[in-house]
């Protein structure tokens, strides 16, 4: 059986491309950056680029492809963004219409792909520090919630930010904050610790994306900005076509997470 925790990125991308790995990628290719994916028509690319720069906590931009290209010079030279993500979401005019395992049939030479930092990247550092992560212990995707906090609008893109949540003791929450200070390009420090109602989350048992996790009596919910935010703002921007990763199914890059820490 393949050791997916310690596999090289190129090998993991091939398994995903060949549909041999189809689940969420948290904990895979340990030590390498994982990225959220947004693929847009060129006409929307500049507005989305501005949106990322205005919202670095939720949309920390790692790389942009050349127009019509499926790879990235640094983050995945031999990659194919249309096949190397385990599951995609396809929106037309703000409506989710398809969740395919590749998007070759939709890609054309007037599309631009964006890689956005993902909190899965700093999970390795948290685990190395002895901070347990409940979603990994329970074997499923991290829970994500749409908040009532508006993102900074840019052109046609506006909407509320999405956060991911990891429960931990207050002691571990403080340590996690210190550790993620060094990962500014993959969401950085938490945006909130404690009461989810403070920013409009009514029920932690019903995430908007991912699966719920158990929160123990001695734990608090810790929230980080989440790169699923573009999916929620896409519903408002209503481009004729936007393709994203399905939550939890990240693009595995060739760059080590140590290159993003300071």
Swiss-Prot record:
PANTHER family noted in UniProt: D-GLUTAMATE CYCLASE, MITOCHONDRIAL
**Superkingdom, natural source:** Bacteria
Enzyme Commission number, as recorded: 4.2.1.-
Keywords assigned: Lyase
Protein name per Swiss-Prot or TrEMBL:
Putative hydro-lyase Sca_2211
Q: Family membership, please give it.
A: Belongs to the D-glutamate cyclase family.
- Coiled-coil positions are none
List the Gene Ontology MF annotations in alphabetical order: lyase activity
Q: According to the UniProt record, what class of enzyme is this?
A: lyase
